[in-house]
């Protein structure tokens, strides 16, 4: 379902599930007024130049925490192959190219009419020029047009992304769900990097991103040698060696 304008593709999908009681729906919008990312943050989209998309699943994976990893792998695989770019996955749910953000992923579990549904939101910068981004993110954001030097057909790209996302999400219940983490590591731009992590209590730690555990939590070796497990939070990658 391709719509001209919505408040949020996640909210529109939620309304459709509630009214139609079916989940074989993909919502894409040319314009999204109130897109959101993780922990309620606003997600900035450029009308008619972005992909703002939400998909629903009525079977929860064995490990719901791995959903964003599966979707990240799917998007990276499609974009890397189609556009010959090196897409990196930044923990936990961002798509990066050349140290700039190309897109992000949001997974939410909602209880609707006595049933649990997984809602997956994808935001992707497609046909923006640098000056289309707000000034405060211009240095940190990129788009497929900037990277490839040509405009991209958004509808054709959605047709490539949706089946690949379905494939990887559904695979979480068909094979060992932890295989997706091995795939994620192949695209990771996080592991081995010097990072600063903001913890849920608003404190910070600094160190090296070592690995993921079986639930997708990030293992960090702090400067004092201690290993810390980060299950939720934000990280900043510092592109320089540790002392």
Features from the language model and the residues they span:
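N-terminal lobe of the biotin/lipoate ligase/transferase fold
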Residues: 1-81, 85, 103, 227-228, ...
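A generic fold-level signal
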Residues: 21-22, 48, 90, 114, ...
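Conserved active-site carboxylates
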Residues: 94
């Amino acid at each position: 379902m391709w719509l001209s304008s919505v408040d949020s593709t996640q909210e529109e999908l939620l309304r459709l599930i509630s009214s139609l009681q079916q989940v074989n729906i993909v919502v894409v919008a040319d314009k999204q007024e109130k897109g959101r990312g993780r922990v309620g943050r606003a997600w900035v989209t450029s009308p008619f130049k972005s992909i703002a998309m939400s998909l629903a699943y009525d079977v929860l994976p064995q490990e719901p925490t791995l959903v964003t990893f599966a979707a990240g792998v799917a998007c990276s695989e499609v974009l890397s192959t189609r556009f010959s770019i090196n897409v990196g996955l930044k923990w936990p749910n961002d798509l990066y190219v050349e140290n700039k953000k190309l897109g992000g992923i949001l997974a939410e579990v909602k209880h609707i009419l006595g049933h649990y549904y997984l809602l997956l939101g994808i935001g992707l910068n497609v046909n923006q020029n640098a000056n289309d981004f707000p000034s405060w993110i211009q240095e940190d954001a990129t788009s497929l047009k900037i990277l490839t030097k040509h405009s991209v057909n958004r509808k054709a790209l959605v047709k490539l992304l949706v089946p690949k996302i379905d494939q990887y999400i559904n695979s979480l219940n068909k094979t060992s769900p932890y295989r997706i983490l091995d795939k994620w590591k192949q695209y990771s731009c996080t592991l081995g990097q010097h990072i600063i992590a903001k913890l849920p209590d608003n404190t910070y730690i600094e160190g090296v991103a070592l690995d993921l555990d079986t639930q997708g939590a990030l293992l960090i070796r702090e400067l004092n040698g201690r290993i810390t497990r980060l299950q939720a939070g934000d990280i900043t990658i510092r592109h320089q060696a540790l002392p």
